[in-house]
Amino acid sequence: MKQYIVDAFTDKLFKGNQAAVCVMEKWISDDLMQNIAIENNFSETAFTVKNSDGCYDLRWLAPGGEIDFCGHATLGSSFVLFSFYEKKSSTIVFHTRQKGDFIAKRNEKGITMSFPAFSLKPVPVTDLMTKAFGAKPKEAFFDRDLLCVFDSVDLIKNMSPNEKDLKELGGTCIGVTAKGDDGFDCVSRVFAPQLNIYEDPVTGSTHCMIAPYWSSVLGKRNIKAFQASKREGVLLCEVNGENVSITGNAVLFSSCELNVAID
């Protein structure tokens, strides 16, 4: 089985978010996919199988189990398929189990993916949030993920949340965000203790919540987002009603043949 390791949401190696992408002729067992994801120990490993011209089935597994949606591993999968399998194509359609179809298009800015926007359901700011982050959020919202809004970029960048407290907050991922500086509309970080990931370096899926929030606050559709992890990354987001288009770049770190027995 061919596997590629890609740095997503960056144009530089060793930045962005790492994803392993396994391109398969047919599906393997769930147990084997989970073991591969654990062995890779990236935030996500993507598995994809072609089902027709320009159309691929796509699944994502974290070390802690399968997830319903992953942005950076979708970008990584798009990059691999455009680079090695669909060289003449400009569009790929991904069929997913729980989120329907995603469309990826390559263009002069990179690869643009269209995703469903998360809802912004306000929730009370709790003492546990303040304890977990070491500062009190001014607002909080919940959908699949928890999003907490703060006033300070420096606070976002320097925050060291308590992992145990984060787990108690719930949410597949936990995003923290503030109004941006240095040409960015927002600066954010994302934590995912429920998936056995303390901090996710660059998170496309959570920006389906972050981008609509800042679009509403700033009164603009196009949001240039910076994720301030150690690896850092840039996401160009466009909010269109119930959808968010996210554009990013990716670079290939390695490719290999996995030495696993496939039935």
Identify the meaning behind each predicted range.
Residues 1-70, 75-263:
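Active-site proximal loop and beta-alpha junction motif in alpha/beta enzyme cores
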